[in-house]
Amino acid sequence: MKKLLPLAVLAALSSVHVASAQAADVSAAVGATGQSGMTYRLGLSWDWDKSWWQTSTGRLTGYWDAGYTYWEGGDEGAGKHSLSFAPVFVYEFAGDSIKPFIEAGIGVAAFSGTRVGDQNLGSSLNFEDRIGAGLKFANGQSVGVRAIHYSNAGLKQPNDGIESYSLFYKIPI
């Protein structure tokens, strides 16, 4: 069953209908946890196609992000999977061919177990908090770094939480 989860995720992501007015992106990320484990993430995002506080310095925008992460490492919680969904706010600084940006978001994530790496999350359903920074190029591609924290916000004990620190690459589709 657990080996079928990545295939089910890819099938679900490929069957999502994206409105023609919204831009979609695919991302890949490789990261490490604070406990020496590795993470591998595939994501699909949809631009909100809205801007706020647009000035000569930059603008605030955002996107919806859906992701699948494979968690490797740890004695008791190796080989776990998670699905996540989050709204992400992005402040994009002004620029011609390269636009630096910072991002932050809070969403939800469902894990294939309560132990991930050497951490006990206490619950399979957790919150996802993220911050990141990167560069967006004129062709729509982006590269950056991201820190994501997962925990159940104290709704169930134990609540060790776990982090993923990653490098990502995003391309428009």
From Swiss-Prot:
User: Without the gene, what phenotype results?
Assistant: Has similar growth characteristics to wild-type in LB medium at different temperatures (25, 30 or 37 degrees Celsius) or in LB medium supplemented with 0-4 M sodium chloride, 0-1,500 ug/ml chloramphenicol, 0-5% ethanol or 0-1% chloroform. Only when chloramphenicol is present in the medium is a difference in the ability to grow observed. The difference is most pronounced at a concentration of 650 ug/ml chloramphenicol, where the absorbance of the wild-type culture after overnight growth is 1.7-fold higher than that of the pagL disruption mutant.
> Can you say where in the cell this protein is located?
Cell outer membrane
Give the result of residue 163 to A, as annotated.
142-fold reduction in activity
Instruction: Recount the known activity regulation.
Output: Decreased activity at low temperatures (15 or 21 degrees Celsius).
Is Transmembrane a UniProt keyword of this protein?
yes
Q: Name one GO cellular component term.
A: membrane
Write down the top EC class of this protein: hydrolase
Impact of changing residue 81 to A/N on the protein? Does not affect LPS deacylation activity
Q: How does it sit in the membrane?
A: Multi-pass membrane protein
**Source species, domain of life:** Bacteria
Q: Would you identify the family this protein belongs to, as annotated?
A: Belongs to the PagL family.
Q: How does it assemble?
A: Homodimer.
Query: What's the name of the protein?
Result: Lipid A deacylase PagL
Which species is listed as the source?
A: Pseudomonas aeruginosa (strain ATCC 15692 / DSM 22644 / CIP 104116 / JCM 14847 / LMG 12228 / 1C / PRS 101 / PAO1)
